[in-house]
Amino acid sequence: EIPGFGTLGFTVPELAPVGNLLETFSPGLGGASALVFGPDGTIEDSYRILQNTTFNCAGVITPWKTWLSCEEIPTGLVWECDPFGIQAARPLPALGLFSHEAVAIDSERRVFYMTEDMPDGRFYRWVPTAGDWPAGAPRANMNQGLLQVLKVEGDVANALNGPVRYSWVNAANPNAPQTENRLPDTAVFDGGEGVWYQNDRVFFATKGDDRLWMLNTTAQTIEVVYDMATATAPNNILSGVDNITMTPFGEVLVAEDGGSMQVVVVYPDGKLVPLLQIVGQDQSEIAGIAFSPDGKRMYFTSDRGGPNGQGGYGLGLGMLYELMIPDTLPNA
């Protein structure tokens, strides 16, 4: 989600503010790139791993160490990319055609979870066939499987009051754009954003209503673990919820799209603590939170926070930050 027309945008920053608009009318300007860091954080290399796609958003590292990149358009695809840039990226139409925001993988149950960034978006899962990802196999082929949509017992708003049961229903036409094939009894989520699977739990964010949701895949329940509209001090500090990442200890790191341009830590007990804030880039958004293998460095982007070619910052080129993190996250 970093606009700027590739090399041309970096050469002529004045073009960056209209990058997203032009991509709407001229698809294929998107893609994904890789940065290679040394153990000390020094950048050693950079290269493209995906190109000629449109509005690439979040993604995920697969258990077999490739990268999945999501296209955020109504006919969007998920693409599998070689992180070394050797093999050509390949589209994965079996995972559905919709405004893909993010994807998470439960390798134990062999299930993919996906968010849809639309005001009337749904929450999806994709279950590969036994032949596509056999038990004991190191990876899925991602060619054949079942696309399903989340259904909640009663009103999905009941999840504000505690866990409610959910089930899955098969997509009506899995090979067509899902905006044209809505199932009326499936749960509606206002702007699906980041999603993360860990320890039988699936967390995902919805930006339209500033909520963080949790699926308990063992109990088959869903609940809201954060809601800006009902949050009280000191926890009412998180808005514009967007990309999410989890630590091995169960904390959810939520990046803000706008809001106060913060990364906020949501602890398992429900407590919220701001980790960092970017000042002076209110028209940007934070995304792409990732950690170095030793856990000592955190990387994240400000998608439109860079020079805009008009003597200032904001609505400009993307920026990448490195944060040297403490041994423990702040808890006060």
Protein language model regions, located:
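Sequence/structural signature of beta-propeller domains
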Residues: 1-332
